[in-house]
Design a protein with these regions (language model features):
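Bacterial signal peptide processing site
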Residues: 21-23
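Secretory targeting and sorting signals
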Residues: 11-14
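Sec-dependent signal peptide recognition
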Residues: 3-9
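C-terminal motif of bacterial Sec signal peptides marking the signal peptidase cleavage site
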Residues: 16-19
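Glycan-processing catalytic domains of CAZymes
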Residues: 27-430, 438-466
Length: 466
């Protein structure tokens, strides 16, 4: 499949009237050093503390029958190599049960280990947070079973529940308490939960599809209050909200949800991950558009600009549960293990993330500067007019994530458009500085009082003052 790569150009804006030049002999001011802000992050012990978690939902499947056809297993060497080659470093095996599908679970662990991929595994012997619910077993038995999983270097933790409803929170709390009682806090072994978001109505936040009996409706804020109580001890927070809908529209609550999550996880001293819409239509759901490269860049870039410490693609594989969907529409790989064009988009995006994650993981998010228009409304809360040495932003529509990086200022400049190519974003500083600029995984050393960045649709560029 032909790989599409947008052209990437980086230039320095030369303002001779202000005495700004790009020559190596130019005198620059050393950037001030500020008190270091506290940072909350989660990384896998096996991968290192400077490797950002980049994941995929739905690990490769065992074989199954579909409409008279047998779909071969995608739990293969080739497919797991593809996970690693795409730049993902963890995968969620939400439908592979270590208890009931042991052989495929073990094979998944072994292949993930071979390709340095971490894996969250389901194990219904320990508990079940899907109906019929099953509380976590006694601590001693839980600990013994957990040791079986820990034999595999690819073991990231256990899969808990995707998109739990409020009426299920008592079950979550019992399981979460037992898990962290046994697993402990001083390691990266985690229990995977994924939260609901503004995609759901207030009634669904509490009682789901009518299965619960909570009388009052919850706002998302109330849902999060109860969610954090139920998942006390969690090592990260993650949620999904898919923005590309209805033939070119954006979900209007996208940035509102990002800001809310940023604020609430800061209160809880938790890092947060987002989901990236890696496909569309899903199970023939026409509401969800199939994203192009600019849309996927935009999802990742805006998440990072708001301080996300990791992200995941939905879906990575084409899951069995989407049996109505056409292969190749809903994820990075199709039903038969074939790579879609979005696999290549993700690979390019993830390559850039791997070049900047050592900075963003170790940076405290301080707010954003928004310039121009936006495809979805940006809340006033969290917005800044300037940040430290950066005094103004000009040019095309943009979001600038503002960070404290070990006492220095760092900025993540994003083209806030999924279609505008060669967008010009001008960063104006209060003096002449030296900068490290990382764009499309390439690093540049630049000097000046202003920088002009030329960005592809949705692209993000990291700027660190030296």
């Amino acid at each position: 499949m032909k790989r599409k790569i947008f052209p990437v150009v980086l230039s320095v804006l030369l303002l001779s009237a202000a005495g700004c030049q790009s020559s190596g002999s130019e005198k620059v001011v050393k950037a001030p050093v500020y008190p270091v802000e506290e940072v909350y992050k989660y990384t896998f012990d096996a991968l290192g503390e400077d490797v950002m978690p980049i994941g995929g939902y739905y690990a490769p499947f065992g074989g199954y029958g579909l409409n008279g056809e047998y779909i071969e297993s995608t739990i293969t060497d080739e497919v797991y190599k593809g996970i690693s080659d795409s730049g993902l470093n963890f995968i969620i095996a939400s439908t592979i049960d270590y208890s009931r599908d042991h052989d495929n679970a073990v094979l998944s662990y072994e292949l993930a280990e071979k390709y340095n991929v971490m894996l969250f595994m389901r194990d219904s012997y320990l508990f079940s947070l899907d109906s019929p619910y099953k509380e976590a077993i006694e601590a001693d038995k839980f600990a013994k079973r957990l040791e079986e999983h820990k034999k595999y270097a690819s073991f990231a933790g256990l899969y808990g529940r995707d998109e739990p409803f409020g009426f299920e929170f008592p079950y979550l709390k019992q399981v979460s308490d037992r898990f962290y009682e046994v697993a402990g806090a001083e390691n990266s072994t985690a229990l995977y939960f994924n939260s609901l978001s503004y995609q759901c109505s207030e009634g669904m936040l509490t009682n789901g599809w009518g299965d619960g009996n909570i009388e009052e409706s919850w706002t998302l804020d109330i849902y999060l209050d109860e969610y954090f109580k139920a998942t006390e001890g969690a090592k990260f927070y993650t949620y999904d909200l898919y923005p590309f809908i209805n033939g070119g529209n954006f979900r209007s609550t996208y940035f509102e949800n990002l800001q809310l999550v940023k604020d609430r996880t800061a209160e809880e001293k938790l890092p947060f991950f987002t989901f990236v819409q890696g496909g569309g239509k899903f199970d023939n759901q026409e509401e969800y558009d199939i994203p192009d490269e600019g849309m996927m860049w935009w999802s990742v870039s805006t998440s990072l600009a708001y301080g996300a410490k990791g992200y995941q693609y939905f879906t990575y594989t084409h899951p069995e549960v989407f049996f109505n969907g056409e292969s190749g529409t809903c994820g990075l790989i199709g039903r038969y293990g074939e790579k879609t064009e979005r696999w290549y988009y993700a690979q390019n995006i993830n390559r850039h993330t791997a070049a900047i994650d050592h900075v963003l993981l170790n940076s405290a998010h301080m707010g954003i500067i928004a310039n121009g228009n936006s495809p979805a409304p940006i809340p006033e809360k969290g917005r800044l007019e300037s940040f430290r040495e950066l005094k103004s932003v000009e040019g095309d529509d943009s979001i600038i994530g503002c960070f404290d990086y070990k006492g220095r200022a760092a900025y993540y400049a994003v083209n806030n458009s999924t279609i505008k190519d060669k967008a010009k974003i001008v960063l104006n500083f209060d003096n002449r500085y030296a900068y490290e600029v990382i764009q499309n995984a390439n690093s540049y050393s630049l000097k000046g009082k202003s920088l002009t960045l030329t960005l592809a649709p949705g692209e993000g560029v990291l700027v660190v003052l030296e």
